[in-house]
UniProtKB/Swiss-Prot annotation:
Record's function text: Can bind to ATTGG and CCAAT motifs (Y-box motifs) of single-stranded oligonucleotides.
Subcellular location: Cytoplasm
GO cellular component, one term: cytoplasm
Quaternary assembly: Homodimer.
GO MF terms, alphabetically ordered: DNA binding; nucleic acid binding
Protein name: Major cold shock protein CspA
Amino acid sequence: MAVTGQVKWFNNEKGFGFIEVPGENDVFVHFSAIETDGFKSLEEGQKVSFEIEEGNRGPQAKNVIKL
């Protein structure tokens, strides 16, 4: 099920960050989960749609689409 959130922060050098979801804990996002061609990056404050899966360290985003 797709969820909509807003990028809290994303570090291009390290390739990960977090997405804020209203009423939920922040969700970890790795650059490999971003659905785009070319350089995979997100901007702070950007709205995204994604799915949540349980990762090794808690919930993480997958199938991230920039809105």
